[in-house]
Amino acid sequence: MSARWPAFIAAPLALSVPAAHATVYLSLEQAQQSLFAGASFTPVDFGRRERVWRASQGGWFIVDQVLGKHELITYALGIDPQGRARGIEILEYRESHGGEVRHTSWRAQFSGKGAADPLQLDHDIRNISGATLSCRHITDGVKRLLKLYESELRQR
């Protein structure tokens, strides 16, 4: 038996569903050029979920996703030939709050960090009030990608 919702109930329910909030800040190509200006990129497939490119100038460009509070955050990490972060870029942010992780001053904290650096929120990386989970998960993601470089990419 098929249930029918009267219009006076169905319409308000449909209107009360929150719209997904997604902001695309940079395309893949824009993020690549932001972190490695003038470089060309060669994709590297090594069977993992992260998308990885070797930069013609030396170094690596990796795109990854982490969970914010409820939604995925797509970010990119540039790693120099010595295994240190050149910087991070936020490509797409889907949360309704906490978009401050895109601010240059927050992202700049990662520059120069390597796999041996602690990268702990509230110690090495400043937290943003109202964006704690986004900050924590991006920080953990960057640390994971720096470890990935050490274990998988450095010898390539």
Residue ranges and their predicted role:
Residues 1-4:
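Positively charged n-region of N-terminal signal peptides that target proteins for export
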Residues 7-16:
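Bacterial N-terminal signal peptides
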Residues 19-126, 132-136, 140-156:
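Flexible, solvent-exposed loop/hinge segments and secondary-structure transition points
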